[in-house]
Amino acid sequence: NIGPRTYAKICELLLRLKANHLAPAMHPVSTAFYKIPENKLVADTFAIVMGSSHCEPLLLNTASEWNSKTMGPWDYGKNKDKINEVLGNRVKENCAYENVYTLALRGLHDAAMGGGDVPMKEKVKMLESALKDQRNLIAEHIDRPVETIPQAFTPYKEVLEIYSNGLELPDDVTIIWPDDNFGYMKRLSGLHEQKRSGRAGVYYHVSYLGVPHSYLWYSTTPPALMYEELRKAYDTTADRIWLANCGDLKGAEMQVSLFLDMAYDIDSFNANNVVTYPARWLAKMFGEQYYSVFEDITSSHINLAFSRKPEYMGWGYWNNYWGGGEKRTDTEFSFANYNEAENRLNEYSRIGKKAENLLASLDKDSQPAFYQLLYYPVKGAELMNHMTIKGQYYRQYVRQQRAAANLIKEKVKNYHDSLQIITEGYNSLLNGKWKYMMSLKQNYEGSSSYFMLPLMEESYTPVGAPKLALQAESEILDKGGISYHSLPVYNTFSRKSHWVDVYNQGSGDLSWTAKSSNDWIIVSQKAGKTPTEDRIRVSVDWEKVPVGESIKGSVEFSSNDQKECVLVSVFNPASPVRDEMQGVYMEENGYVSIPAAGVHRKFESNDIKMNILPGVGVEGHALQLGNPISPLQMYRAGDVPRVEYDFYTFNAGIYDVYTYVLPTFPLHAERDYKLPEHTNSDTKYSVRIDDGSISTPSTSAIEYSQVWYDSVLKNCRVNKSTLYVKKPGKHTLQIRCGDPGVVIQKIVIDMGGLKRSYLGPESTKCN
């Protein structure tokens, strides 16, 4: 359990990290801090200022220390005197030590205070009364003016609604603004709150237990996101207390170091250098000669986890509240479209191999620390993604009756077993120094199942003679057997290649040949022999292909008496000329895809500057529409600050424009925040094509809604605007500033050809 020896190590670590404040473990599985008298002596020896979480008033761990059988209900309306007696004793016992006293009235176990359907006015009145009582207890036991004693109030979850409905809070109390548990600050100090003598602080999560899904295995919170959110907090007077929820700490060491370094000197950071923090942090420990490889591995690892954390790969929800456990399902990464799943797995394999090679090259004394800090997180994420996505591959292979199905099944089992092995390796380092510290299961029994072997109940054993079957890129088939297939249209402005899977549905070796109908069709392999499958790349020789908007050809695949044909269509118009379209985002297969950082023109003002943010967003870079604390903009005004992108379409019509945005909340200082915590006001920006109508989507969503669930799990809200394009040709897409600080990740325009995927297609820029 956690006692003085553990807290001595924690307090020493805090001093080494330039920290001086600790809110100890609060869940019943850990012995409450003040149940062991030596704990506070340890903290005092290290000059650590003790505090407590948002639901623990006056240092009392209500989840563990309140005994309803002997003390009565934890209900301020029914048991006020006993509650105040216990709280007063806690202050009396600890008044000789340095503390920050939390003023709070929440229920047990991080829940809302009970009492039924109480009108909001009564909730406000009750909380004000409780806070007044707690202030009186502090004044009674500490011989100093109460205004000089550090006190904190955290408007977390339902308490924010009460605060927003007129709660009167003493001016000297520090308001600790919380994030939404997923790294997005829900609210910051407005102009009137910035004048408070108590100023403000932050309560920020780099680890979390709760809905829609916990992330407790190890932290992958992006440094760029942390800086973007915490900088705007600091700039609005949240500079008094910074508190990070770091779970069991070991899995969040880099994020905790960054959090405290920013708390100590945030002005030494900016949007560019914070991205390299993980590499610099590692290089300081293992040698500057490894900096470039550290930067490559960490930037890719964080970017991959940005769109889906390893803990979320089961694609279900943390389900402890409703019973029955997490319901796992297929991921939304596409196997058929935009090479999405394949690219993700290939990138994980690349950085996993780099981390493996680096581990082997280090001296033995450095290997244990490197194993924990980089190798295990990267290799673990690689194996988790391969296990989950390949498990989904297996289920598809069975439906297609591919002979390779059982090979995939064995690989999935190996990924699962390897996860157990590297976790056991972590816990056996240095003769078991960190034994039990790392576990794949970081949750209540049954509430999450992301770490378990994927469902593979079906099986397929190929029988009979070898049998030819095909799947072409962007083709979704449950079974092979059709004799006609088509690839995505080849476009002279992108000049991509596409793939065809040649696979065997029988046993034995499948011998096959491929024959192109025209000399401008290039096949990567013209013949083969495989017991399972071959992937063939089909490309176009653009020096030989005729000019035209609908050039047709084909590739015929044969095996014995079987023949299957793949249609090859080429779009190679005489006009516009490819060289004249350099840098323009071109329509391709019925869509246009634009990375938000790939701006053609910026229109800025004294207040609003457009900034490229590296290290954040599904494309690795994103665009921020001004500083978050800048004045609100009139997004319909003609001269509003905006960015523009040039795109070209070959058809007119009504099209859907999808904007991928960071799911931030409205934080502008002049906003009216009198709203419940689960009905936050919208954070607006606007979208326009040419001089057409203006659409005004939002980045925020009602908390605990399905939109919010999806947005925080993806670190992205996808908004649809339906706009009109009058005629074919070159057009301008505008993204216009409304609430400053909105972060745009990418834009996709669907002309009718957009396929299903998780992150959308890659850029269609003509280069």
Regions found by a protein language model. Give the residues of each.
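Gly/Pro-rich turn-and-neighbor structural signature
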Residues: Y34, V42-D44, G72-S197, N343-A369, ...
